[in-house]
Amino acid sequence: MKHLLTCLFFCSILSISHLTQAQTLNNFSLKDIGQSVIITMDGNGKMVNLGVDMENYGSPFFDPEFLPANIVLATGQRYENVLIKINLLSNEVIYKTPEGKELAVLPAIKQVELNKNGEILFFEYGFPVYEKQNHKTIYQVLAKGKVSLLKYFFIQVTEAKPYSSATMLRTIEQFPRLFLYDQSLSLKKAPKSNEDLLSLYKADATKLQSILQKNNLKIKKEEDFIKCIAKLNEN
């Protein structure tokens, strides 16, 4: 399968390199892709140095394994069957080179189609600001249409030094949070009950009520929430 060609910009922590010749993803080199940032912020705005040697519990990655994916850049250019991991802490897509290097792809990305055990999972950037989240925050798209159901992963990092131990312990926890994005072009924290959903979308309340009742859905269950929004978007 042929890869699309493009001129891309990539940067490392200490320097920025300009790719002057179109290349496929299969022959990138270290000068073309910068390393993933080591110092970053957790969900509380705390600086986290992932380069420090510590005993770690938990992971900032959506999946710790490299999985095949298609990447669509903000320019519309598409790359297929790339091995990646998604760093939910730094909001980066980490690309694995043929030489085994793990590097961050830093050009603006619009969408990632991640293949996990045959199931295609969609992730997108570019949503409005909500508290500490911005257009560079990555969301998993659970349902998309006139109303989109999004999942944001709040990452909390805690560090502690146990009594009489010389080793620092770092715990990385993921807290999924659901959001709705609609034609008002704003992010809304997803309601947790059927009643609150009907109150939020009063114009579609009759339609939503019918969907909820006919399918016996309770949106406090994520799978039911996904079905509800998907059916709303069908009409």
PLM-predicted stretches and their roles:
Residues F28-I33, V105-A108, L114-N115, S193:
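General structural signal for secondary-structure boundaries
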Residues H18-G58:
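Sec-dependent signal peptide cleavage junction
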Residues M168-R170, Y181-L187, K192-L208:
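Extended, compositionally simple fibrous regions characteristic of intermediate-filament-like scaffolds
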Residues L198-N235:
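Long, compositionally biased interface segments
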Residues F62-K188:
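Aromatic-patch recognition
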Residues M1-N26, C228:
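Bacterial Sec-dependent N-terminal signal peptides
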